[in-house]
Amino acid sequence: MKEESILKKCDSSSIKHVPSTPLETNCPDKYNPKTWPIRLKVRNVIVISSMTFLNQYGDSVFAPSISNIAEQFHASRTLVTLGATLYTLGILFGNLIFAPLSEQFGRRPIYLIGYSVFALLQIPIALSVNLAMFLVFRFFSGLFGSVGLSNGSGSLADLFEKKDRGKYMVIYFTVLSIGPGIAPIISGFISQSSIGWQWEFWILLILSGFNLFWAFLLLKETYPPVLNRKKFEKYGEIGENEPVALRLTGKQLLIKLLILLSMKKPISILLSQPILICVACTIGSIYGMINLVLIAFSEVWKSSYDFSPGISGLMYISITLGLFSAVFIAMPINQKFYSYLVKRNGGEGEPEFRLPMGFIGITLFEIGILLFGWTARYKIFWFVPTIGSAIMGGGYIMTSNPLNMYVVDSYGIYSASASAGVKIFQLLFGAIFPLFAESLFRRLNYGWGCTLLAFILLACGCSLPILFKYGKQIRNLRPFDPSKY
């Protein structure tokens, strides 16, 4: 392809004679992703975003069919909901394993191997003969499908300078966020058809296989220390202060894997970095709540409004519209405000400049969940609770995107490992909250149940103004040193 030929042509001029100070050249350096042609970067972003989208699509893909699956396997709705919980726990463990492994072997092989297994695992899920088989393979599906989620933000940090990263981070995190909202729209009609809930997973297999084909063709390695290792092995020299990933022996790699599974590294990073604790609590709460609502959403329309499964699935469009509205209206405004703060700060960007939109996002999410809960409680005309769910979806994007970008900007090439600590909280909350959905709304009704959720989020979100005002001082109190982990 054109971009690859440019990289090959410039290889000798930009790499062969690498001094201690980076060489000035107009040619892109194939060992430095930040210098690649924009089209090559965008291709990587599209493939990685698609992987993450389908992983999140799989999270709620069977939500409209929970009752059907429960009936087939002679189980309760809560037990079947474990399929979502275990999937999310699989994503959690995948983040702990695949993010650091990419820092040893590179991003590309981790993406391709993990995603190949994810695609194949849809087969035994669709062919499950009992609930245990369904739940076990759902866990492993989440585990191997997490490669996009665990390494996506790190890949974007590899590809783009901080000043150019914002719009691509918005694309990535938006595609990530809309997956759970789109899946039930399709699955709702499948659940009421005669073809059976299994086709929800056959469709996921087809989509994953198609995306995997393009990943093998288009995805390039982007992790700088691994690229520097390749450069050093080929040319025998690299620039000063350029990080290099060391090759581990089989025994060293096994020890590292055991440490990863113990969660030592991400938990150590999380507990040693106050800003990560604040971000983790906020993102964890809002992610858990959106997962809870997604699981309960279809049942709200069936029980309160007597909608069919297909029409109930269509109601998820309101959440998706809220997500898209936030992307095309709110996030560009946030980027302009970020540029304004950078200009006011003498042209120097700070991670805290990403946060202002988060204040508005949390407020909107709370307004949306209260409006949805109380109007559904009193069975007010169906259009009104959809307004609440749309506001809720927009608030979710406007909160989670700035916070995720804040972590990426704060930790740079180590953002994959830093994000893993945050994702422990996020995914634990996302796994646990849906289990409470049925009992929460049965005991407190939709109005008071959503009010309780709003108060929990309010308590967690109080940290955002503190981070915006004092985040830099807090970061300087406990500087991040990757060698300690």
UniProtKB/Swiss-Prot annotation:
Alphabetized, the UniProt keywords read: Membrane, Transmembrane, Transmembrane helix, Transport
| InterPro entries linked to this entry | MFS, MFS_dom, MFS_trans_sf
- Identify this protein by name: Uncharacterized transporter C1348.05
Question: Where do transmembrane segments lie in this chain?
Answer: 79-99, 117-137, 139-159, 170-190, 199-219, 275-295, 313-333, 355-375, 380-400, 421-441, 448-468
Q: Which GO terms describe its cellular component?
A: membrane
Mode of membrane association: Multi-pass membrane protein
- UniProt record, GO biological process: transmembrane transport
Kindly list the GO molecular function terms attached to this UniProt entry. Answer: transmembrane transporter activity
Establish whether keyword tRNA processing is in the entry: no
Keyword presence, Disulfide bond: no
Pfam families in the cross-refs: MFS_1 (PF07690)
Question: Where does it mainly reside?
Answer: membrane
- State the family it belongs to: Belongs to the major facilitator superfamily. CAR1 family.
> Which compartments does it reside in?
Membrane
